[in-house]
Each structure stands twice: as C-alpha cells, then as structure tokens.
Design a protein with these regions (language model features):
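Conserved RNP beta-strands of RNA recognition motif
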Residues: 52-56
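Conserved short beta-strand edge segments in small beta-sheet-based binding/regulatory domains
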Residues: 75-87
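Short S/T/G/P-rich N-terminal loop/turn motif that feeds into the first structured element of a domain
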Residues: 1-49, 59-67, 84-105
Length: 105
C-alpha cells in the first residue's frame, strides 16, 4: 500500500466549522477514486495547515490521482500542496483485529 501525506496552508480566518463543511463538501469525490482505500482529512488550525492522509492500493493509482490537474485544483481551493509518498508495509487494524502486511493485502 501507499500512504500519501498532503498538506497545505489555509486562510487563518477558516474556523473548525467552516473547514469541516469544506471537507464534507468534497468527501463524495473520493468515493469512487481508483485504488483509494481510505482518506482522512487533517487540520492544524493553530498553524493554519490542513490536508489529507490517503491510503492507496499502489503507487500507480496514487500518482495518477495526484496529477497536475489535481494539484491545480487543491492550489485554487486552498494553496499549493506539499505531497509525500510513503510505502506502507504493515498495518495494525484494531477494528478488524488484524495485522496486515504487503504479503496478505
């Protein structure tokens, strides 16, 4: 699996309520994203930063999603994002009470 950390600066005037509304507004976009397993919206209002943590099934799908058009969309909506891609070898899933590795994903 691939984890993508996306962060961007947000306007200091954005409140928690407004930011949550913006996140809920875009959430349906991700329901049919190829290869996306999960997306978590994140924020640090104290430092005017928000973003998302994405879990993709593979690097190809992650890179396809974060193409130039997607980066431009995020930039226009908030600000230019910073992206970091990570290989995810092992997951501890306490909901399902499983430990998942690359071998059994």
């Amino acid at each position: 699996m691939i984890i993508v950390e996306v962060t961007f600066k947000i306007d200091p005037s954005l409140t928690e309520e407004i930011l949550k509304e913006k996140f809920l507004e875009t959430a349906p976009i991700y329901k049919n994203t190829p290869g996306l397993i999960r997306k978590n919206y994140i924020s640090d209002l104290k430092n005017n930063i928000a973003g998302g943590i994405y879990c993709f099934d593979n690097m190809l799908n992650a890179k396809r999603w974060f193409d130039d058009e997607r980066i431009e969309w995020i930039t226009n909506r908030y600000s230019k994002p910073k992206l970091k891609f990570y290989q995810n070898y092992v997951v501890v899933d306490n909901e399902s009470k499983k430990i998942i590795s690359d071998d059994n994903m």
